[in-house]
Amino acid sequence: MQSFAPIEALFKGRHFDRQIIILCVSWYTSFKLSSRDLVIMIGDRGISVTHTTILGWVQHYLPEFERRWRRYARPVGGSWRMDETCIKVHGQWVYLYRAVDKAGQTVDFFLSRKRDVNAAKSFLRSAMKNTRVPTKITLDASAASHRAVREMKQTGELPGRVKVRSSQYLNNLVEQDHRRVKQRIRPMLGFKRFDNAAVTISGIELAEKIKKGQFKTGKLGGCNATMTELWNAALAA
């Protein structure tokens, strides 16, 4: 089982209290706020912080926060709806591969500079590593995704028993789910670097999974716990 350093060690040497850092990171990824909005909101609490400092916290802490939350993840279903959508990074379109199960639970995501067979394979490998092997995959009309699945079945990366189908109607579920993520991205006013975009989107996906009830929060204080209490409990070693 993966071990984690005490939470105090994560914030050693920081000039700000860890509760402020956790609050800023969780709010930034959970709500339709820009970093400048957060500066004003935190300022109302008598704390002066710059928007660049908040963005630095997001990039520094989100990967570790996501790993710690993962300990409490509920299993996703085996019937996946897979699709990709476009977002802009430094003025260029990049591709966000995502999948949800038939209940709308987020399976995984993968940000790629290209929309091709290799990108689709990378997404599926990541999704299976982080969750489970699917029993069924519903795709859109993307030829690259269909080819990726065929080739992975031929090489044994995907079991031959995995059913594959193409249905725009069934994939409406994941397309609607894209909107929630993209609505959260919009106030951020664009990404300048690909790596920063990937980290930030991982935080947005984490926040969406929390909202969908994809974590065993009973171990973290239950339904009566506040968002701040849930985050503190989940991040504790």
Protein language model regions, located:
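Residue-level recognition of single "structural anchor" positions
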Residues: 1-237
